[in-house]
Amino acid sequence: MHTVSRLLAALCIAALALSGVAGTAAAQSAADGQFVVELDADGDANATFSDEFDLSDPDEREVFERADSNAELRATAAERFGEEMRLVSRTANEALDRELRVGDVTVETAVVGETGVVAYEFRWENVAAVDDERVVLAEPFSLFESLDRELVVVAPEGYAIESVSPEPARAEGDTVAWPGLTTFGEEFEVVAVPDSGGTTEPIEHSRAGTTHGGAPLALGISALVLGSLLVGRKR
């Protein structure tokens, strides 16, 4: 991808996937990065959406260094990303009896070996439902067919994952993860319960996870961020 286009996609400043060419490219392979949701017992979460750059590639290094050195660009990216995540939350709120809210977004950069990381961090209020002591994450991920990068969900401190759908590619203690482009849809759900401290029971999986083999269109609800964030919104 052209350097400027790569920068705009990574920093969520311009449209990415609503054109035919970009939509096809986004669908062919998962993006390098993660969406990490670290849940709290009250249903809030610390969320981090990251994009990764191969610093051994001159074009990608240039993009990362521009992001790393330009505070104004990072601030604009944080503002735009926050707007789009609030739009995601408002869409979910239409069908819920609780209100998802997105706090201020900060953009951080880091270098890990030969990888540059641009991370958007924010507080996500009420993203999970709380039923007695059960913490259930479904919306907004259940409203979309897939996510373009790895999704990682971490149970609240002192909790364990009781059940999850679809079956995760990784399940390690209080953490489950799916690779990018795994099919989610309305069956997506992660249930966490207080850890009894006894023998850990196997996590229940309601169905196997699959990844898209074709090229689904990127139909984000906005032309700014969701073309690269949420792929194939259900109608």
What kind of feature is each model-predicted range?
Residues 57-122:
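Structured domain cores in non-transmembrane regions
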